[in-house]
């Protein structure tokens, strides 16, 4: 098991943790419906880049 040789100072500890933050995933707005969705994914109502790709239960 790895054990540290010396105590890490608060400054070094902060530098080590500097990339541990959470980031919101990038979202896009569907131009036809105005809904937000993950980029490069189909929106919840079946549209992708302004075109209807997938039939949904609401369509039937």
Swiss-Prot record:
InterPro entries tied to this protein: Ribosomal_bL32, Ribosomal_bL32_bact, Ribosomal_zn-bd
Disulfide pattern: none
GO cellular component: large ribosomal subunit
GO MF terms, alphabetically ordered: structural constituent of ribosome
Tree of life domain: Bacteria
Start-end of Basic residues biased regions: 49-60
One Pfam assignment: Ribosomal_L32p
Region annotation Disordered: where it falls in the sequence: 1-60
Keyword Ribosomal protein listed: yes
Keywords linked to the UniProt accession: Ribonucleoprotein, Ribosomal protein
The keyword DNA repair belongs to this UniProt entry's keyword annotation: no
GO biological process, one term: translation
Family named by the database record: Belongs to the bacterial ribosomal protein bL32 family.
Protein's UniProt name: Large ribosomal subunit protein bL32
Source species: Bordetella avium (strain 197N)
Gene that this sequence comes from: rpmF
